[in-house]
């Protein structure tokens, strides 16, 4: 009787360890899938910035004519003034 109780407890402990390891592996694969789906590549550093690209107002590198670095939004935006 005592031996069967010990085997049952050992079996339940083993089952919980296996379930926990399986859950960790599943969570790892879920995190991998989510990181692949929501992976956003950083724009390459270029000397010339396009419309709505992030910029630095103190070092305006917006390319096209009429594009200026907005001090408010810090993005290359059209400038219709002088």
Curated annotation (Swiss-Prot):
Disulfide bonds join 48-63, 55-69, 62-76. Keywords: Amidation, Antibiotic, Antimicrobial, Disulfide bond, Ion channel impairing toxin, Knottin, Lipid-binding, Neurotoxin, Potassium channel impairing toxin, Secreted, Signal, Toxin, Voltage-gated potassium channel impairing toxin, Voltage-gated sodium channel impairing toxin. The modification Phenylalanine amide is found at residue 80. GO terms for cellular component: extracellular region. Expressed by the venom gland. Transmembrane segments: none annotated. Residues 1-21 form the signal peptide. Negative results: this toxin does not inhibit potassium channels Kv1.1/KCNA1, Kv1.4/KCNA4 and Kv11.3/KCNH7 (IC(50)=53->85 uM). The presence of a 'disulfide through disulfide knot' structurally defines this protein as a knottin. This cationic hydrophobic peptide acts on a lot of different channels and has an antimicrobial activity. It blocks mechanosensitive ion channels (also named stretch-activated channels or SACs), without having effect on whole-cell voltage-sensitive currents. It also affects acetylcholine receptors (nAChRs) through interactions with membrane lipids by prolonging the closing time without affecting channel conductance or opening activity. It shows high affinity for lipid bilayers. This is M-theraphotoxin-Gr1a.
């Amino acid at each position: 009787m005592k031996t069967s109780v010990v085997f049952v407890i050992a079996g339940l402990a083993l089952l919980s360890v296996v379930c926990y390891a399986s859950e960790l592996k599943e969570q790892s694969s879920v995190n991998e899938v989510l990181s692949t789906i929501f992976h956003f590549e950083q724009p390459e550093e270029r000397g010339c910035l396009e419309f709505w690209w992030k910029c630095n107002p103190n070092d305006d590198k917006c390319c096209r004519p009429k594009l200026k670095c907005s001090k408010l939004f810090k993005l290359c935006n059209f400038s219709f003034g002088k």
